[in-house]
Curated annotation (Swiss-Prot):
Entry protein name: Large ribosomal subunit protein eL20
Organism annotation: Rattus norvegicus (Rat)
Glycyl lysine isopeptide (Lys-Gly) (interchain with G-Cter in SUMO2) crosslink residues: 11, 128, 170
Residues with Phosphotyrosine modification: 63
Places the protein is found: Cytoplasm
SUPFAM superfamilies (UniProt xref): RplX-like (SSF160374)
Lineage: Eukaryota, Metazoa, Chordata, Craniata, Vertebrata
InterPro entries associated with the record: Ribosomal_eL20 (IPR028877), Ribosomal_eL20_dom (IPR023573), Ribosomal_eL20_eukaryotes (IPR021138)
HAMAP family: Ribosomal_eL20
Length: 176
């Protein structure tokens, strides 16, 4: 899978094709993060074939739809449990991100894993994504923003104006 652009969250439901032995096969639902619905269906078959004796040729997709965020204007903390294949083996990992949407946090995770661990998108498997309360956060990178009186430093900038003289009688004001 190529994690191109912002990933979207899809709910994919599939099952085995009905046979004379099993008229109503069980449905399997997955939460897939992918750039589009075609990749989401492909990832569904990849994961389901690892878990159950199911293949695309002997199964069908019952439903594939995009899941939209309930509150996309509120900043939330997300905990992501994942496994990834590195050059030395398979590792489990727990990461925390702060974002507006679940899909945004997962996209951030894919970018971060590529930057920090050189892990490509195809070697990362997202196991669980959960919104977590501020008190349950463990990572200092996320916890630093949980201050109600948070302040950000104003940069001390020297603006060189194009059409003003270099030498003048008054000192410049560089505090904005």
């Amino acid at each position: 899978m190529k994690a191109s652009g912002t990933l979207r969250e899809y709910k994919v439901v599939g099952r085995c094709l009905p046979t004379p032995k099993c008229h109503t096969p069980p449905l399997y639902r997955m939460r897939i993060f992918a750039p589009n619905h075609v990749v989401a269906k492909s990832r569904f078959w990849y994961f389901v074939s690892q878990l159950k004796k199911m293949k695309k040729s002997s199964g069908e997709i019952v439903y594939c739809g995009q899941v939209f965020e309930k509150s996309p204007l509120r900043v939330k903390n997300f905990g992501i449990w994942l496994r990834y294949d590195s050059r030395s083996g398979t590792h489990n990992m727990y990461r925390e991100y702060r974002d507006l949407t679940t899909a945004g946090a997962v996209t951030q995770c894919y970018r971060d894993m590529g930057a920090r661990h050189r892990a490509r998108a195809h070697s990362i498997q997202i196991m669980k994504v959960e919104e977590i309360a501020a008190g349950k956060c463990r990572r200092p990178a996320v916890k630093q923003f949980h201050d109600s009186k948070i302040k950000f430093p104003l940069p001390h900038r020297v603006l060189r104006r194009q059409h003003k003289p270099r030498f003048t009688t008054k000192r410049p004001n560089t505090f904005f």
